[in-house]
């Protein structure tokens, strides 16, 4: 994939800020973590004094983000009420433990770093005990480096790009409580192995700003590349005028299995044009990635109430949507209603009150409490960030929407579902398969009516498919009779011309050879006459 992400910020700048706040904090300096608090001996929970945990939440105030403070804050406060009340915290933490939370605007750039450093500098070393966020890649990178340097645990439902998986040095104190983009790549790999596919076209929107779709398909590209699968890539900027015909032509010229990432309206427009080009009758398999469990990205919905609905319903029979697997339980319903109520009180009306980020930051609080409990029991303190972050890795716990599993590298396993149209007449869609990240297993659901029939979708990846324009009401599969006749006649004419050229060339070569032999014979006779003439002259002399 072109220009893979390199998250770089000046180390001199980071070191300067670190020195500004260094020395007086209780956590010690260095990425190793835990060294400063080891000598205190082991204490039991009952003997520990109440803890005041200072949490710094770094998220953007701009509500256009799915992870804005307005959206996520109710989920964090819901989790805090749970752990401070009669829930997890009362059982795990010393009596009287309280969380003091500060919310700062991270924007989606350097402001997150400046907020953290300004807060520390103002109190000369009063570092927070926990950092939640940021989400945006370019905001999270310097904060994660600083957290590592200051021995602070950092939990985020973002920082999902492939670069953050390298935890051996600068990102050693980061735990990602939402599935990273590479986990989507692992899911797509399992799906391809199930269907015995080896080639894919990656088609995505890239505005060069947040680049969510770019980072998503970067994860898919990296996993496929490691496993030897072939990918072709085509990107566009959907914030500008789109040439949908050009997008579809590039798909036709590349692969039969297409993985797309864009807004729901753009996905619908691409599918409509593909349908008009006869590409939705089984020659192609289209997949759309629904990012973050948000309908802002293509969620598989074809209906808009416009004149194209009937055509879109037909087109979407060839589209499958990949989304996060969700286990609905009573507690989740209560959580969703409380988040919705809190958000609406702040004057924000939207469709997606609860998405991956809202769930993730709620679960981050629960995970931190579990890890802190184990660290305190072992005789360490809340300032031993390295110890705390290690306790968040390689474990499974119950989150708000189901089980959450973090791998040995501090990244959440991704569980995903595949949605497809199972009733073309009604346009009904349902889950047809699930991927379980911890086991690396993809399973088709039993007793589901698959649109293509068998459990495996057969796509001829090597066949070149000819396409003709067709109206929505006509069958768009195969070639018309006149086209077949034209191909046959053209092939016969071509063969006839080749044979005529062959015989002409053969006759011409024979003629040339005969003429050459005759000339050589005449030349020999002429030479003999000249020699006889010369001898006669010498004899006369």
Curated annotation (Swiss-Prot):
Extracellular side: 27-481
Cited InterPro entries: ANF_lig-bd_rcpt, ANP_Clearance_Receptor, ANPR/GUC, Peripla_BP_I
Disulphide bond pairs: 108-136, 213-261
Keyword RNA-binding: no
GO CC terms: extracellular exosome; plasma membrane; protein-containing complex
Residue ranges, Cytoplasmic side: 505-541
Disease tied to this protein: Boudin-Mortier syndrome: An autosomal recessive disorder characterized by tall stature, long digits, and extra epiphyses in the hands and feet. In addition, some patients show joint hypermobility and dilation of the aortic root.
Subunit structure: Homodimer; disulfide-linked. Dimers can also be formed through the C-terminal cysteine of isoform 2. Interacts with OSTN.
PANTHER family per the UniProt record, alphabetical: ATRIAL NATRIURETIC PEPTIDE RECEPTOR 3 (PTHR44755:SF1), NATRIURETIC PEPTIDE RECEPTOR 3-RELATED (PTHR44755)
Protein's recorded name: Atrial natriuretic peptide receptor 3
């Amino acid at each position: 994939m072109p220009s893979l992400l390199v998250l770089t910020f000046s180390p001199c700048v980071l070191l300067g800020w670190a020195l500004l706040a260094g020395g007086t904090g209780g956590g010690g300096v260095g990425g190793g973590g835990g060294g400063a608090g080891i000598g205190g001996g082991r204490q039991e929970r009952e003997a520990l004094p109440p803890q005041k945990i200072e949490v710094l939440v770094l998220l953007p105030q701009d509500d256009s983000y799915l992870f804005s403070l307005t959206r996520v804050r109710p989920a964090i406060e819901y989790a805090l009420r749970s752990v401070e009340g009669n829930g997890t915290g009362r059982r795990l933490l010393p009596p009287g433990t309280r969380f003091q939370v500060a919310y700062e605007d991270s924007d989606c750039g350097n402001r997150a770093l400046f907020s953290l450093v300004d807060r520390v500098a103002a109190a000369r070393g009063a570092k927070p005990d926990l950092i939640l966020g940021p989400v945006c890649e370019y905001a999270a990178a310097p904060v994660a480096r600083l957290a590592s340097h200051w021995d602070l645990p950092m939990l985020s439902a973002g920082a999902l790009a492939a670069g953050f998986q390298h935890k051996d040095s600068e990102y050693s104190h980061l735990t990602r409580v939402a599935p990273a983009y590479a986990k989507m790549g692992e899911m797509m790999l399992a799906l391809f192995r199930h269907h015995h596919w080896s080639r894919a076209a990656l088609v995505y929107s890239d505005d060069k700003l947040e680049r969510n779709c770019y980072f998503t398909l970067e994860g898919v590209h990296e996993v496929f590349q490691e496993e030897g699968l072939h990918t072709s890539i085509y990107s566009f900027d959907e914030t500008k005028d789109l040439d949908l015909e050009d997008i579809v032509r590039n798909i036709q010229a590349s692969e039969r299995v297409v993985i797309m990432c864009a807004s729901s309206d753009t996905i619908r427009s691409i599918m409509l044009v593909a349908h008009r080009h006869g590409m939705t009758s089984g020659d192609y398999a289209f997949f759309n990635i629904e990012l973050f469990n948000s309908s802002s990205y293509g969620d598989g919905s074809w209906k808009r109430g416009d004149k194209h609905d009937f055509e879109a319903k037909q087109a979407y029979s060839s589209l499958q949507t990949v989304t996060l697997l969700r286990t609905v339980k009573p507690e989740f319903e209560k959580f969703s209603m409380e988040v919705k109520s809190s958000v609406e009180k702040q004057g924000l009306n939207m469709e997606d009150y609860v998405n991956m980020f809202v769930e993730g930051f709620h679960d981050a609080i629960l995970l931190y409490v579990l890890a802190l409990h184990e660290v305190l029991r072992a005789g360490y303190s809340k300032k031993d960030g390295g110890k705390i972050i290690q306790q968040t890795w390689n474990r499974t716990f119950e989150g708000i929407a189901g089980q959450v599993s973090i791998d040995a590298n501090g990244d959440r396993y991704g569980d995903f579902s595949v949605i497809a149209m199972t009733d073309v007449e009604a346009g009904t869609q349902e889950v047809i398969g699930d991927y379980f990240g911890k086991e690396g297993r993809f399973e088709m659901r039993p007793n589901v009516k698959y649109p293509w029939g068998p459990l495996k979708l057969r796509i001829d990846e090597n066949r070149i498919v000819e396409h003709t324009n067709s109206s929505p009401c006509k069958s768009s599969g195969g070639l018309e009779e006149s086209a077949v006749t034209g191909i046959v006649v053209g092939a016969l004419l071509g063969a006839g011309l080749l044979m005529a050229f062959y015989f002409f060339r053969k006759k011409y070569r024979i003629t040339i050879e005969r003429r050459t032999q005759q000339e050589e014979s005449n030349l020999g006779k002429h030479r003999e006459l000249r020699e006889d003439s010369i001898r006669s002259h010498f004899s006369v002399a």
